[in-house]
Amino acid sequence: MLRDGTRRSYSLANAPYQEGGIELHIRHMPGGVFTDHVFSTMKEREILRFEGPLGTFFLRDDSTKPVILLASGTGFAPIKSLLEQAFFKNNTREFVLYWGARTKADLYMQDLPEQWALEHSNFKFVPVLSDATSQCNWQGRTGFVHRAVMEDYPDLSKHQVYACGAPIVIDSALRDFTTVCGLPEEEFFADSFTSMADSTPR
């Protein structure tokens, strides 16, 4: 919250077991009151007021179903928190993370899930770019991130899905996963946020 009372909501990126600070992933939105302040005028040790944590985006421990994690852009933040907590608790469920972004540069922490895949046999990472260019020499998946999930998992009837990102991405995933892939609607958990720069699916 800014001094004038302006509020913005962000998902926590650090896991519940981690102490010592709050980690947020904030994308600079030129013209945005809060992000302009953060990236241009906010000073080190400046005091901000926080409220929370709020929301219901956490791993349901009462299930053993394999988990599909869907992130778009900085929607990776709460996915990171969820996974780090699961790894800390030695959760043995199968986790597959699909992280969608426009360009390779937007996969701003790509090394981290790649490292998780090396360290945890029950975790797989699938990055997906919607606007891959020849300059980035991308050899991975392309297109909309939720459609990459559907290509790999045409039957989601026995899965749980955790998704975070722009509303258009979350809404598309919920609609298609439930109507086309047989995902029970009660097994879809989301942390959706609004961003003018994220107005098209990834």
Segments predicted by a language model, with ranges:
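Polyanionic, low-complexity intrinsically disordered segments
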Residues: 72-73
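Reductase modules of NAD(P)H-dependent flavoproteins
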Residues: 98-202
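Histidine-anchored nucleotide/phosphate-binding helix
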Residues: 78-88
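Ferredoxin-reductase
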Residues: 1-46, 102-103, 129-131
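Phosphate-handling active-site elements
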Residues: 88-96
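Structural motif
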Residues: 66-68, 96, 160
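A short, basic/flexible loop-to-alpha-helix module at the beginning of a structural domain
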Residues: 52-64
